[in-house]
Amino acid sequence: MKPVVIHTREDFESAIKRGFNPLCEDAWRLPMAIDLRREIQREIFGKNDAAGNQKFYKYCLEHKPLVCEECGCPINHPSAYNVSHILTRGAHPEMAHDPRNVNILCPKHHSSWEQATTRREMLIEPKNERIIRQLKKEYQ
């Protein structure tokens, strides 16, 4: 059975009140219409500038497990550097503030993800490839 797609602000607010977060943790189980997702992301994070990025990184660090998604080590002193975009902000600014477009990574694996030569060897690569296909499909 296909998941119910959240199309309205009321449905989004209802999910939040019930303890779900279709913007982040529950995004794949409770998908949102892309126009609504963009609108809410803009409201929460603002523009794709330094202030907006700071809000976005803080949100991700508050809503995602603070464990490297590649090696499983705990992120003891979380910072914006631990929030690694799957699709780069520069090449895909429309996805820069989509929490589905990030991994939480330790510094070593953040650097590895950014290098095409080491990216293919990473455990998160197959999952990220599926995410890339889904995000590109939704944002086109």
Regions found by a protein language model. Give the residues of each.
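Short Fe-S-cluster ligation motifs
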Residues: 97-113, 133-140
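Charged phosphate-binding loop/patch that engages nucleotide di/tri-phosphates or the phosphate backbone
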Residues: 120-140
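Short Cys/His-centered divalent metal-binding micro-motifs
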Residues: 73-76, 102-124
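Single-residue recognition of alpha-helix capping/boundary positions
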Residues: 11, 109, 128-131
